From Swiss-Prot:
Official protein name in the record: Polyribonucleotide nucleotidyltransferase
PROSITE patterns found in the cross-reference section: KH_TYPE_1, S1
E.C. code: 2.7.7.8
Record-annotated KH domain positions: 551-610
Amino acid sequence: MFDIKRQEIDWGGKKLTLETGQVARQADGAVIATLGETVVLCAVTAAKTVKEGQDFFPLTVHYQEKYSAAGRIPGGFFKRERGATERETLISRLIDRPIRPLFPEGFYNETLVIAQVMSYDGENEPDILAMIAASAALALSGVPFLGPIGAARVGYQDGEFILNPTLEQLEKSDLDLVVGATRDAVMMVESEANELPEEVMLNAVSFAHESLQPVIKAIINLAEQAAKEPWELVSYDDSALAAKVEELCYDNFDKAYRLTRKAERVDALSKAKAVLDEAFPEADPTEKLRIQKLAKKLEAKIVRTAILKEGRRIDGRDLKTVRPIRSQVGFLPRTHGSALFTRGETQALVSTTLGTADAEQMIDGLTGLHYERFMLHYNFPPYSVGEVGRFGAPGRREIGHGKLAWRALHPVLPSKADFPYTIRVLSDITESNGSSSMATVCGGCLALMDAGVPLTRPVSGIAMGLILEKDGFAILSDIMGDEDHLGDMDFKVAGTEKGITSLQMDIKVAGITEEIMQKALEQAKGGRAHILGEMSKALGEVRSEISNLAPRIETMSVPKDKIRDVIGTGGKVIREIVATTGAKVDIEDDGTVRLSSSDPANIEAAREWINGIVEEPEVGKIYNGKVVNIVDFGAFVNFMGGRDGLVHVSEIKNERVNKVSDVLSEGQEVKVKVLEIDNRGKVRLSMRVVDQETGAELDDNRPPRENAERRGGERPRRDRGPRRESGDRPARRDMEPEFAPAFLRKDS
């Protein structure tokens, strides 16, 4: 019934298994990949025909984590997997980016890749396994695919690289780097690093590429056993048509790409392309698409030739020059921190908001619930490129760009112990002509500094490009949108003066050598240093204090055995503290208490209240208190947060008090001295030895009572004679009839 094919390899000391032929047999290609006890199923399907008028490759990748994979049931009202989470979206992009360039030009069949995590052991991360499974499924499907690719994650600790580190190892690692690559070329890099030098980053990429070679070999072996017949790809001889397009458009395209302003250049290109419609009025839809593709190739040829032969870029810059930069902080008056960062025709308006611990992002996933205190959200409205388009919930691109900027800034943030705030950075791209994610990094850094967040060091980011031909290559600093589209590499680097914090690379062609990558990193280092210098003109260092509009957060510690006293039964005490003082109070299991309010006086009031609860009263010390209950023999006074003591009627005044309520009332503020604390913790207080106006201690001039140890004096014990033993007592039924109860009498 099943024709199962399997490949097993030892990969970094663990067994990696690729299997096909048992599950999802109706898909064009399906593979179950297993590493440890983590299992990912990936299935590939593709449409057999192309939709009419389609001129692009519609590849869709979906990655999904099943809660059942980790033995969990989804939280909340809906008990099933719902829309893609941010993590699932990011991993979908991680799978998409290295495989998309490997589909041949002209293949426009709709293709769907679905990767699902079916089992998760908490040790082997499923994202790398999903990339491998997707590559293997494509290799088996027969769909035109110039792969396969392999994937690997690299950590770095104590000067050593770690292949596919566990979650525990990643927490201690200075690097989290993911590489997707073919046998001969690196296609994709995604990383976060703790300010590592360029040499370490380059060696990490090389280590990953070498380490994933056994995976590629296993996929090839599996494909030799189980791959379907390859699809035929329709090709056209467009040499004559290409010559005609070049004849009609070359001069106008060349003039357009000498215009340095984007809007003028776009208008000129539109007019130049209008000539093609007039020249080919009888062209059918398919032929029109081919003409448009040839025109795009001609544009690329003009731009690439100018860069390689003349060293001239679209906007007139040389290869290393960064566009003019203008930075401004405090741009928005009511935010906690803000910055407007403009680089050429790319602009980001970024704000920072500080909040308390209850504003942390709750994330529910395979590893359970956890909370994130740093959030970065990136928005790309259509007006930023002068277009009409969808505006609303963030798309995959916005989520991906936001995460890239998050990785760049995250390593330089202070620890929660040093800066106990929840931090949200919001970046709105108001203009875009390339490298908007790196503008978010620069603007986000300035907004954080403006908000008073004590960063380790400022961070800047730059996008690099590459033009690669057989006779040479050129590396471009701070690429524009057109250079991104017409070039061969998008290489984003962010970091401090000390080292790299984030690196993302997407390569569209094979042949990127280690020499090219090394030169790109060195050129990016110079660009980042220049940008840091320009940023420092707006704000050279972190503000010494946070904004007056931001909440103040202070911490204190209480003994663990006192936590329940601070919280109170059903949270009664802590709710009273919050309601009375106006400060938020958060208590952790280790006894750490965080007090927050926009008014420092509220924080101080809450601190004093909590200190009053956890501190032990001291005999002989004077405290401020409040009468909470009046009884016949005195009054109960709350004098230390939740601590009450008794002021006996004799300790209210030196003179006799006949009725306590004549002197005191509930809610009255009084000053008391602690006289005694018994072995049960009950406290005896006195008001009469304290000046109720000043709080000063008074001399106790009242003479002590005689025989004070026994109120009312010693009374003689009445002698009732020897006590009878119980056996001497007459039984109830032996009582005299006249004294016995009626129901015991014999005559009753």
